[in-house]
């Protein structure tokens, strides 16, 4: 008997959903389109396939350090044209690539008349060209290249922003990041730093024999954090799936499986508010190490960030607005209970629940109705009265058990768990635990979370029985840590908005 397999994808012939955004129109410049036609009419290809360079612009600029030796040296490079200045038989322009900018001179006597006319009449700022020429300095001492050959590599059809005003509108910069990167070199440097930051994290952990893994983004059960998920539907499987809110539960499954040092740099998705420190799609790293606890993970977090800051900035101080933040070790460590006493003069456990409610109301702290215990008021009042005062790096440790369903019970303090958060510039930057590895206790915690969810807490976690069963095979004592890449980049770059460090942040659809 032969079984027929249906490989037809039911989504193949489905129309696009009504809410897919297909709005917009092309924004090509009429004069640039006319120049494109002029280029084609000359038999030139406005979009050729490749160009051979013998150096980037930064490498060429270095040669000017020994100008006596390198004057007249022939170079071949490529980049985008900026700020074209025409002076009769001479045309100056800036040529920019990823590494820098240099002035180029197109002189009528150095090019055939037809080529000079082509450049003068048909090239624009924004075009990408390849050049060959010789190094020289102008009478004013500006390092330059005298062009003897040029090739159009890509004709731009959209006009760049006007030189002196540039691209200043924040909304436009976020929606058209490609344009932001073209005209704002300092914005490109932010993302160069971000790329180097991620590379340095990988190097730091690889040096300590951690292994990098990839875990599912589409999950049948979401978990690992208290957050609202994004929901989708898989047509072939006929079931709901969720975009991951954290990789935690899968990484701990790997530790159960025998990997003792694991990490993942992951894209996570949380269906939450958007503000200066939150984006629904964000990047973080989670690290787990067997036979370690939350004290070890605080040590690892401090060593990692201190080394990153020094390697990327050359020092330990970063500027955030009016604050200068010192990231040199050692960092302050204080319990949540102790921090509330130190920064707000408040001892939660010396007050009744009604008194704590009134304190919350007096300080205009929202969501006080959700607090039903001293532990929940401790977390609530800490967030409202202390967090924004933690400018220099500070580890807050020992959290109430009520809001930490994945952390191990404290070895000495009843009602608390071995959890820490790292605060910097008033922001939470990292979070870590001595990981809960008792499957019966984990099941109990999940069930308590599920009760909250059914009562309307949309950020409460669900029961993941497969994870509970994984713990049933034995998770060794384990320390874990999660660190926000976006916020760390903000700190290193001295920026106050998360949208400045995400290349394509989520934006509301334009009407």
UniProtKB/Swiss-Prot annotation:
> What Enzyme Commission number does this protein have?
6.1.1.6
A single Gene Ontology MF term assigned here is: tRNA binding
Annotated Mg(2+) 1 binding lies at: 421, 428
Q: Where in the cell is it found?
A: Cytoplasm
Q: Which GO terms describe its cellular component?
A: cytoplasm
Spell out the Polar residues composition-biased ranges. Answer: 1-11
Cofactors per UniProt? Mg(2+)
- Record note on cofactor: Binds 3 Mg(2+) ions per subunit.
Q: Name one GO biological process term.
A: lysyl-tRNA aminoacylation
Can the keyword Protein biosynthesis be found in this entry's annotation? yes
Q: Where is this region: Disordered?
A: 1-21
Which NCBIfam families does this chain map to?
lysS_bact (TIGR00499), PRK00484.1 (NF001756)
Q: What's this protein's family per the entry?
A: Belongs to the class-II aminoacyl-tRNA synthetase family.
Partners and quaternary state? Homodimer.
Query: What HAMAP family does this protein map onto?
Result: Lys_tRNA_synth_class2
This one is known as Lysine--tRNA ligase 2
Q: What species was this sequence derived from? A: Methanosarcina acetivorans (strain ATCC 35395 / DSM 2834 / JCM 12185 / C2A)
């Amino acid at each position: 008997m032969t079984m027929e397999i249906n490989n037809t994808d039911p989504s193949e012939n489905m129309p696009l959903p009504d809410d897919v955004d297909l709005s917009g129109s092309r924004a090509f410049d009429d004069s640039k389109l006319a120049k494109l036609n002029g280029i084609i009419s000359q038999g030139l290809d406005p979009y050729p396939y490749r160009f051979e360079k013998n150096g980037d612009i930064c490498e060429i600029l270095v040669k000017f350090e020994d100008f006596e030796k390198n004057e007249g040296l022939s170079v071949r490079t490529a980049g985008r044209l900026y700020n074209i200045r025409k002076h009769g038989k001479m045309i100056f322009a800036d040529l920019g690539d990823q590494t820098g900018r240099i002035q180029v001179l197109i002189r009528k006597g150095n090019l055939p008349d037809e080529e000079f006319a082509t450049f003068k009449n048909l090239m624009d700022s924004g075009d990408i060209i390849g050049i060959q020429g010789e190094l020289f300095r102008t009478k004013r001492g500006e390092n330059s290249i005298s062009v003897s050959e040029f090739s159009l590599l890509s004709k731009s059809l959209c006009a760049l922003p006007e030189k002196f005003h540039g691209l200043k509108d924040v909304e436009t910069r976020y929606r058209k990041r490609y344009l932001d990167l073209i005209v704002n070199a300092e914005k490109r440097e932010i993302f160069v730093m971000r790329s180097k930051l991620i590379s340095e994290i990988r190097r730091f952990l690889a040096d300590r024999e951690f292994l990098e893994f990839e875990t599912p983004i589409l999950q049948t059960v979401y978990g690992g954090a208290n957050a609202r998920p994004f929901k989708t539907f898989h047509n072939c499987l006929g079931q709901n799936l969720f975009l991951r809110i954290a990789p935690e539960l899968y990484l701990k499954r790997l530790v159960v499986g025998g990997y003792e040092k694991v990490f993942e740099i992951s894209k996570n998705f949380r269906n939450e508010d958007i503000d200066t420190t939150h984006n629904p799609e964000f990047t973080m790293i989670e690290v787990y190490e067997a036979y370690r606890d939350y004290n070890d993970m605080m040590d690892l977090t401090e060593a990692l960030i201190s080394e990153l800051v020094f390697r990327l900035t050359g020092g330990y101080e970063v500027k955030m607005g009016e604050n200068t933040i010192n990231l040199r070790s050692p960092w302050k460590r204080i319990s949540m209970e102790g921090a509330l006493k130190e920064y707000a003069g408040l001892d939660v456990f010396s007050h009744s629940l009604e008194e704590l409610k009134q304190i919350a109301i007096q300080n205009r702290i929202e969501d006080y109705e959700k607090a039903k215990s001293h532990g929940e008021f401790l977390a609530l009042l800490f967030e409202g009265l202390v967090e924004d005062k933690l400018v220099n790096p500070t580890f807050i440790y020992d959290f109430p058990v009520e809001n930490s369903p994945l952390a191990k019970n404290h070895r000495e303090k009843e009602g608390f768990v071995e959890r820490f958060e790292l605060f910097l510039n008033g922001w939470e930057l990292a979070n870590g635990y001595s990981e809960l590895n008792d499957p019966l206790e984990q099941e109990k915690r999940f069930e308590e979370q599920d009760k909250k969810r059914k009562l309307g807490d949309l950020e409460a976690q669900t029961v993941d029985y497969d994870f509970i069963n994984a713990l049933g095979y034995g998770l060794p004592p384990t320390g874990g840590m999660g660190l926000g890449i976006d916020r760390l980049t903000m700190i290193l770059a001295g920026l106050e908005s998360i949208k400045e460090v995400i290349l394509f942040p989520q934006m509301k659809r334009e009407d």
